[in-house]
Amino acid sequence: TVNNGNIQENATEQTTDHAGAIIGFKTQRGEQVHARIASYFISFEQAARNMKELGNDNLEQIKQKGQKAWNQVLGKIEVEGGNLDQYRTFYSCLYRSLLFPRKFYELDEAGKPVHYSPYNGQVLPGYMFTDTGFWDTFRCLFPLLNLMYPSMNKEMQEGLINTYKESGFFPEWASPGHRDCMIGNNSASVLADAYLKGIKVEDVKTLYEGLIHGTKNVHPTVSSTGRRGYEYYNKLGYVPYDVKINENTARTLEYAYNDWCIYQLAKE
């Protein structure tokens, strides 16, 4: 095994921030090795359940199923009128657009979603997604998901509500928990846009509560979550340049748009 970059011989387990494993097989020339590996965030038992997803398929069969699944996802959009290189560019970009947010939940023995929370360290029911920053993705990616992949985006919206319940804030950049980077309160745009386009989450009261909470609070340790400078913005309508808060103009513009999104949701 590997502990923070250091190989530990004859050790089969590690408890550390950065762990790894090295596995070797004694083979003869031309011999093929097929190994099955399962990962988990919850327990060894969950890893065994995750392994069942592979069934008895070999690598080639899994590859073919993966190609079929991606063709179904990418095939929701058909383009015409261009050349082969343009088609390749379009679908390559669409593929990359759909890699994130990343699923951060697993299925329990009853087939129900369950997740390890990066926010409070508990194993809880429901969806969870990570590895996305709304400062970038609220502009184009999530509007695309609303239109073309609404069922998947509904799971993402439920996951956002779980994040609020587990941490007290909607995420602005999840990786896997709250990450301190970028500006804005653009979870408001992501949540309001989805709801107004017909992706109705069950707990809309909690959704709205969380949005309002984010307009007048900032995370105690991750200042990019919530609204840094909300005291000035809520009183003056802008974040001044001389209050030792960076990106003043950008924050003001983002917060104003975020407020408009919350207003549209409130009217609904």
Question: What is each PLM-predicted segment?
Answer:
Residues T1-F129, F169-E172, V201, K205, ...:
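Acidic/polar, glycine-enriched structural segments that form the non-catalytic walls/loops
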Residues N56-K63, V79-L84, T130, P143-N146, ...:
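Hydrophobic alpha-helical scaffolding
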Residues S92-E106, T130-N153, A192-K197, W260-E268:
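Alpha-helical support elements that line or immediately flank enzyme active sites
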Residues S117, G126-F134, F138-R139, L145, ...:
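Long, structured ligand/cofactor-binding scaffold of large enzymes
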Residues T1-V33, Y40-F44, M51, M152, ...:
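Active-site cavity-forming subdomains of large catalytic enzyme subunits
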Residues K65, A69, D85-S92, R139, ...:
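Extracytoplasmic/secreted proteins, especially bacterial periplasmic and envelope-associated proteins
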